[in-house]
Amino acid sequence: MMYNAPLDDMRFALNHVVDLPGVTSAIGKEDSISPDLVDAILEEAGKLATGVIATTNRDGDVSGARRNDDGTVTTPPGFADAYKAMAEGGWTAMDAEEEFGGQAMPMVVSSMVNEIWQSSNMAFALCHLLTQGQIYALQKAASPEQQAVFIPPMVEGRWTGTMNLTEPQAGTDLAAIRTKAVREDDHYRITGQKIYITYGEHDMAENIVHLVLARTPDAPAGVKGISVFIVPKFLVNEDGSLGERNDVHCVSLEKKLGIKGSPTAVLAYGESGGAIGYLVGEENKGLEIMFGMMNHARFAVGLQGLAVSERAYQQALYYAHDRKQGTPLGREDGDTIIHHPDVLRLLATMKSEITAMRALAALGGGALDLAHADPDQEDRAALLIPIIKGWLTERSLGLTSQAVQVHGGMGFIEDTGIAQHYRDARILPIYEGTTAIQANDLVFRKTIRDKGASMTALLDEIAGEASALTGHDDAVVARAAAAMTDAVG
């Protein structure tokens, strides 16, 4: 069963959940970004997703990425061509600033497009997700010279980006990082090992730009001594052409439960003298810089939770309309399971929760846009990110499980394909910060820091919506209003 972008549901979120004209006006783009343009963007993204990207999803899960004897990595069939199609269509340029060749599209719009990519093939779309995050980080923290060299090729889709944090002894505890960076003239020599590096090596782009956390020799202990470095796979000549291979290599790929089409690499830095890296910002300020990229990635992972749930729902709905099981009284032929009450319950639950997930994601995208234009709005956006990442990813586990349940015994058989979505979803509450990390972030960083002002404002907004719906003529709406009122106290 092929994927079709839920364009009507996306239009509903943009028109009735988020004030799209208000957002575009706030960021000074009301004249250049019209509703008709946004509609056309979503339609064209849907065509590319259905016709090209989604066709690679099953093969990616079955064949997976493969490391070759020379250390190169071959991605599944169709992945490289699909990424080329994205680049040629200008889709890799959506988020970047115009000065770097980007389109500076509002986040509330680009997040809808990213949902489409992630639904069509989550393992494939991870490459674009991390590249977007690195572009965002470099736009904020890199020097003008670094920006000029590294951002435009990623915007064009010729290069891709990664985020290198984790080491065997340093997962959530980044204070345990041991990768070293020793200054040498205008650059640093990087030595160490990084693990769980998504698209750390692949064949979809000319170059890979790694953003690496490391320590200088005299760095303070703990997280206060972490710096961040740009380490390209191939060094870049003064004219922008690619030079010699840098001293960073893929030594193995992880064998995973899900997202098997994405190469998750173990990278070795400095086996032949040290990889050349370039300091971003100041020494010992790396974690602050990387958090900018991580927040972008956490929002994007929340979108993945929505996306995989949507894909699983579509497949479950198709199966329920197609599968005949049981014969109603008075009929000789069987009936499709869409008429079974419990199947209807499962599908209705999935649809309603996915609608809520998309609404929350749209609110988050709009909040990020407003924060980009007005620093006073940053607290609201920051508050929503751990909520989006935590709730959307946790619910994706339940919703993809329900999609398997709709299939009955066939859901447990890999040939149907529905199990892939269940397996793919399992990583989402883990990477880019576990759900427990999101909870800590929400309480200790996002709530306590302003003495609960942002959270109180959000709860008051929810209470106001509930109050406006109290006593509504529609009994379902009235019950929802009562539940909202109870939830916010």
Residues of each region from the PLM?
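Amphipathic, small/basic residue-rich leader segments at the start of a protein or domain
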Residues: M1-A125, V149
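Glycine/proline-enriched, intrinsically flexible loops and inter-domain linkers
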Residues: K47, A54, F100-Q132, Q139-L174, ...
